[in-house]
């Protein structure tokens, strides 16, 4: 590497020039893609190592437990960079999601030392953390001797930092006093509306402005467009049916899952606000949803949007992102920061967060922390967002990155605007408590019964609240 080449890449690593200018100047120097990538990694390693000893755990080997996911793919693709920068070897096991969480629970509950770092959803930490299975990452984040000065914890979106931290006391606010940082945010999903621009335009329709408008348009499409229906949402007997579009709308209409008045949890999903919203939700499904809604998971919702079978979905925005390329409807997908309640001022999307957590049983915690810093750091997440599919990025600096904006505007028009409109109100709206999966699965089952007409909305939500109160009491969570 010549001095001119080294200076060029060091200037980029110091953020004195942008990626586009770097690539243009590298090309003028006659550097190919492989050489450019190698020199860029070397420059970034030099910049990161300037004020922090990344080689302190040289010679150690880490083992990761990963879900099969684009976030994991982005890290694996660039893993050689981490190994060269730290001298730490990394091995990993990857499992599909239908068995992944069973693998995590088995490893942690047995206090296995097999894995040092693993992927986790934020909701799962409500079980893993209080059980003593996770490291509270505050001990690393708040210790300048353990954390690189360039890491910039504050750059991670504040709602994500708080949504992955909790005191462990049922009902206490996420990110509140005494909260432990159980995971590092790694990527997330905003539950919003994605829509088929071509299908709506053919009916002379604009994207829906609120839930009543969505219901009307979904009903019209289900009636007028052969082989298509209006709105796709999840409906299987699973916690995931509640956490996506349903809870986002439920919150926007003023609903809450629990009250914490008096320091005790009380189920209140059967409030007037909760009942009124749920009636609208079921009206939407009956008039404009899929005929076999009770079988719908992430996959059916996603596939129908990409196949042109559904006109709209109210689910993770990254579904719309992934369906925009390589599908029948590629190029036809639009995105909207959706405010369901006509009287609400802004969206309140519930979110799913994939994070990285450290096993409390790892004997290589300092090395594990170096990996977690690298994997959730600005450079790697920018790589994931611009060169792979690590969206939605958890760092504001990545959303501000010129190359990422160019990528979005070129192939995913409207996605950046959807994020900017929804992100301020995007967070986890569930009340943290250890029976989360029991509660939400029972809630989904109750929705199915209401949908089928086996019970009214009023009675169904009242029965659900009574049942959950009993479960909390039996578990010793309430008196």
Describe each region flagged by the PLM:
Residues 11, 56, 201, 223, ...:
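Conserved C-terminal helix/tail region of periplasmic/extracytoplasmic solute-binding proteins
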Residues 77-78, 242-253, 276-373:
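Extracytoplasmic/periplasmic substrate-binding proteins
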Residues 167-186, 191, 215-266, 310:
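Extracytoplasmic/periplasmic solute-binding protein
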Residues 75, 142-146, 151, 155, ...:
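C-terminal lobe and pocket-closing loops
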Residues 55-57, 138-161, 235-236, 253-276, ...:
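Short, solvent-exposed loop/beta-turn-alpha elements that line the ligand-binding surface or hinge
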Residues 1-21, 25, 44:
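N-terminal secretory signal peptides
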Residues 51-54, 125-189, 334-336:
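Hinge/lid segment of periplasmic solute-binding proteins
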Residues 216-222, 260-295:
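Glycine-centered hinge/linker elements that transmit conformational signals in sensory
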